[in-house]
Amino acid sequence: MELSLSTSSASPAVLRRQASPLLHKQQVLGVSFASALKPGGGALRFPSRRPLPRPITCSASPSTAEPASEVKKKQLDRRDNVRNIAIVAHVDHGKTTLVDSMLRQAKVFRDNQVMQERIMDSNDLERERGITILSKNTSITYKNTKVNIIDTPGHSDFGGEVERVLNMVDGVLLVVDSVEGPMPQTRFVLKKALEFGHAVVVVVNKIDRPSARPEFVVNSTFELFIELNATDEQCDFQAIYASGIKGKAGLSPDDLAEDLGPLFEAIIRCVPGPNIEKDGALQMLATNIEYDEHKGRIAIGRLHAGVLRKGMDVRVCTSEDSCRFARVSELFVYEKFYRVPTDSVEAGDICAVCGIDNIQIGETIADKVHGKPLPTIKVEEPTVKMSFSVNTSPFSGREGKYVTSRNLRDRLNRELERNLAMKVEDGETADTFIVSGRGTLHITILIENMRREGYEFMVGPPKVINKRVNDKLLEPYEIATVEVPEAHMGPVVELLGKRRGQMFDMQGVGSEGTTFLRYKIPTRGLLGLRNAILTASRGTAILNTVFDSYGPWAGDISTRDLGSLVAFEDGTSTSYALASAQERGQMFVGSGVDVYKGQIVGIHQRPGDLGLNICKKKAATNIRSNKDVTVILDTPLTYSLDDCIEYIEEDELVEVTPSSIRMCKNQKMAKKGRQ
């Protein structure tokens, strides 16, 4: 038996899906529509698998495309009662302090509520170091308009956070210091914002500094826009002059209002509302992931189209071919400083979604039937790598809670779920892993977090990730900006010259006698540079860097001139042994400290390593030929985790435990011979 279906056209008609339940994806009963059409049109004949009890009538008609005006209208729908902005800046230009003032003036807190400084830096590590590491969401309401604010990291090593955040917003507040002007990270974040086509409001912060030069800063920022190929509309940016700590802003540096009103007005006026498809199929890109012990993984992102409701069944897509189904158990929006439960979220708003197991950054939460994935987030490649391995020192297992390679592997894989800019690969042995990141600070923050969580492990020295293109070896280069007093400029210039740095700009700043030096330098030359540059400038220089590009191999670079003092045997250090050892260099350990053979206990005052016995005791006899001499020991050097990672060389390791940080020689390399 055959099923007949009449058509009004000799050419294959495009079947509407709603025409009949038998029609699906240009097929009828599983047979291709085009292949069943006989030449000359008329009837379609499909073989039936079994006799039909009664005739079935199907209709087919050509689909008509939507008018161009309707498509255009969909694209131009804007939501005027919402603004999504990110605050971006170079490190220490005052953006987190500015957010504090914005939250206070928007009445986010009670008048009698006591709040700490830098409210958005809630992480312990952020508060200790005075930097923003993770992006944070909050919102304020100004004149019936909800303003979603995202505070972003200012350090170039956490650029991956900035790149993710820019997917959620429609505009940025570019905060620039009134003295320093645009810095390396300013260039990086502005470049990304312009690539997204975002509107930019420039905030010249710290305008109350005595040496402020607002006109120079605005002109320099405009030149930066031109260099980054900004459009005419983007170059016509609004400049706001502000003092974040005082909570004042204005359109002129000489005429500041008593509050941040001019800044809020500029946000509403210059940043457009989100571009949405309110009636379209649901689409939301998971831009950030948080974890809650009770709710599990929480996906954060902006709703691009449709309406998301609590209890809704959705499709979670990684790509066109990889999708799974889930149900939204809880839904939150950001109001003031908190997450607030809600039953539904409209397109254009930023929300947090619970109930989707194993949701990953870059996945799309879409409509169950018509959903399609959004473009995934692209993040720049890592430039530095370090080896992580199980602790093999004689003191292993004494202080840590998680010490096995399985513990280490699971923790590193868990980090990859949130940290898009990081990569983890297997090393040469089963208990070694290679972790790649955007810089040494990027990886050091991970090490510090793991240490505080109870992990015990060893890390090797940072190494740059080179590329080979057309049989040419390329290495990463960075732009380094050094702020140094003129009196110490000579040693700093000499040091950067030894590190293969090439100066391309030098500027003097006002009456403070400070000089800005700009260099293009290999990333290898920056390893261990921070301590060296502080020593050369007597603690007065400020170094900032940002990745520039890959370039030709610059040749050999010597990063450390002095060797190490290495413990000769296991034991406990004594004052008697340290008194003679300190004549050989500066010590890392004091009296009464347990040490092991191969541990680095000091800095040798000459090139090459020197083995010392700092555990020997004074022989006791019954004869007193002379009186006892009082031993005076120098104060040992205290090295932080960052300092230790900068100090070690190819054949050395840092032992990291929850309560101690030690350096030692790599015994595996010692057996092979120093390479």
UniProtKB/Swiss-Prot annotation:
GO molecular function list: GTP binding; GTPase activity; translation elongation factor activity
Keyword presence, Phosphoprotein: no
Alphabetical UniProt keywords: Chloroplast, Elongation factor, Plastid, Protein biosynthesis, Stress response, Transit peptide
Biological function: Putative chloroplastic elongation factor involved in response to chilling stress. Required for proper chloroplast rRNA processing and/or translation at low temperature. Involved in plastid protein homeostasis.
Domain tr-type G: 80-275
Comp. bias regions, Low complexity: 59-68
Residue segments, region Disordered: 43-76
A Pfam family reported for this protein in Swiss-Prot or TrEMBL: EFG_C
One Gene Ontology term, aspect cellular component: chloroplast
Transit peptide location on this chain: 1-58
First and last residue of the signal peptide: none
GO biological process: protein stabilization; response to cold; rRNA processing
Major localization class: plastid
Stored PROSITE patterns: G_TR_1 (PS00301), G_TR_2 (PS51722)
UniProt note: phenotype after gene disruption: Reduced plant growth, pale-green leaves with reduced levels of chlorophyll. Chilling-sensitive phenotype.
Transmembrane segments: none
Compartments in which it is found: Plastid, Chloroplast
SUPFAM superfamilies in UniProt: EF-G C-terminal domain-like (SSF54980), P-loop containing nucleoside triphosphate hydrolases (SSF52540), Translation proteins (SSF50447)
CDD domains (UniProt xref): BipA_III (cd16263), BipA_TypA_C (cd03710), BipA_TypA_II (cd03691), TypA_BipA (cd01891)
Gene name of the encoded protein: SVR3
Family under the similarity heading: Belongs to the TRAFAC class translation factor GTPase superfamily. Classic translation factor GTPase family. BipA subfamily.
Highest taxon listed in the record's lineage: Eukaryota
Name the UniProt record assigns to this protein: Putative elongation factor TypA-like SVR3, chloroplastic
